[in-house]
């Protein structure tokens, strides 16, 4: 795994999280369909496809984000979620 690539993807995940929270500020960032927002933004407004050297199918990325959220929540790692997700996305898509 390329640690630099994972770090850059973690930055993108943090960025989309901040954007999502601003867009959904009226609900304090709560959005049951957050993963669709994230995947759409990551694929259309970020360098994610270039960093992965491929463009994931949006619905697959959405599913992966939901699964990562479930795994992260249940395992409770000490690593911040953006870095944890990024490592796994790089493993899957590169």
PLM feature spans:
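Eukaryotic low-complexity, intrinsically disordered regulatory segments enriched in serine, proline
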Residues: 1-94
């Amino acid at each position: 795994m390329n640690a630099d690539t994972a770090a850059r993807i973690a930055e993108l995940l943090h960025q989309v999280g901040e954007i999502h929270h601003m867009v959904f500020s009226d609900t304090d960032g709560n959005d049951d369909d957050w993963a669709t927002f994230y995947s759409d933004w990551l694929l259309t407004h970020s360098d994610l496809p270039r960093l992965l050297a491929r463009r994931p199918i949006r619905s697959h990325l959405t599913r992966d984000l939901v699964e990562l959220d479930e795994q992260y929540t249940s395992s409770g790692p000490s690593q911040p979620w953006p870095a944890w997700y990024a490592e796994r996305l790089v493993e899957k898509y590169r």
